[in-house]
From Swiss-Prot:
GO terms for biological process: spermidine biosynthetic process. CDD domains: AdoMet_MTases (cd02440). SUPFAM superfamilies: S-adenosyl-L-methionine-dependent methyltransferases. It comes from Buchnera aphidicola subsp. Acyrthosiphon pisum (strain APS). Its main location: cytoplasm. This is Polyamine aminopropyltransferase. The keyword Transferase applies. The gene is speE. It is found in: Cytoplasm. PANTHER family: SPERMIDINE SYNTHASE, SPERMIDINE/SPERMINE SYNTHASE. Keywords: Cytoplasm, Polyamine biosynthesis, Spermidine biosynthesis, Transferase. It catalyses: S-adenosyl 3-(methylsulfanyl)propylamine + putrescine = S-methyl-5'-thioadenosine + spermidine + H(+).
Length: 286
């Protein structure tokens, strides 16, 4: 065992993961979160918020690509996007790659997270905060979605886990307001954790989303940082045709973007909606 200091994640009571700290870069409390940033030889820089790993340099692309490109490519003509959370800038970076998108609104509760990630994780945002299409708002996501008059083609909820101020972004009230601020054929997506270890959170999301969307599903990705199996993303829309897109149609849309990806591709897009049977069983029983 290396004699360097180790840090143990405190997401679960009876099991977890640890990281060797090569170098501590930052450790302070903001008005909203306890934040720690350190270097690790495997994952590079790691950001921890409230004792839970949020993002790493090494594998952030998987999470950010899947939460962004699956709904954008499925829809085909996104013009306006609302990002709730996402202070590390990764979702914003991916959204900004699309020239067809005209307006981007981002609502982040903690400006300190944005500033820290600009400093320690500059490749996450990759200058996206300078994009002229961006309207950056520092506010609680639920507060914003309740009072805004705008509607969006796509709403992406890139939140922390449902603890502390992140709880607001997992409530039925939040999903209701998101649905009301989507255009007629809009899509809502959100991170929903690792199903094998966070089953109850996913089932609660499923029950709440079903109240407001005709098509409520989850899709999946394997993100090494998020311990415990496949990670699931919530999907809500009133247009059931999006998930019926053929492989050929998805391939054409991706080709037309002229974008390169590190994880996402047409076959990943289609297959991500095919969930393991143990997840389907639990969702069907709920």
């Amino acid at each position: 065992m290396d004699h360097k200091k180790t840090w143990h994640e405190k997401l679960y009571c009876h099991l977890g993961q640890y990281f060797l700290i090569e170098k501590m870069l930052y450790k302070k409390k903001t008005p909203h979160h306890q934040v720690m940033i350190f270097k690790n030889s495997v994952f590079g820089k790691i950001m921890v918020i409230d004792d839970i790993v949020q993002t790493t340099e090494r594998d952030e692309f998987i999470y950010h690509e899947m939460l962004t490109h699956v709904p954008i490519i499925a829809h085909g003509s996104i013009k306006s996007v609302l990002i709730i959370g996402g202070g590390d800038g990764g979702i914003l970076r991916e959204v900004c790659r699309y020239k067809m998108i005209e307006n981007i609104t981002m609502v982040e509760i903690d400006v300190n997270i944005i500033d820290l990630c600009k400093k320690y994780f500059p490749n996450h945002s990759n200058q996206a905060y300078q994009d002229s299409r961006l309207n950056l708002i520092i506010d609680d996501g639920l507060n914003f979605i309740k009072r805004t008059k705008e509607k969006f083609d796509l709403i992406i909820s890139d939140s922390t886990d449902p603890i502390g101020c992140g709880k607001n972004l997992f409530r039925s009230e939040f999903y209701f307001n998101c649905k009301n601020h989507l255009e007629e054929n809009g899509i809502f997506v959100a991170q929903n954790g690792v199903f094998f270890l966070q089953k109850n959170e996913t089932i609660l999301t499923y029950k709440n989303l079903k109240k407001y969307f005709y098509d409520t599903r989850f899709y999946q990705a394997n993100v090494p940082t998020y311990y415990g199996g496949v990670m699931v993303f919530a999907w809500g829309t009133n247009n059931i045709e999006y998930r019926k897109n053929s492989l050929e149609k998805i391939q054409i849309r991706i080709k037309n973007t002229k974008l390169d990806f590190n994880y996402y591709n047409a076959k990943i897009h289609i297959s991500s909606f095919y969930l393991p049977q143990y997840i389907l069983n639990e969702l069907n029983e709920s």
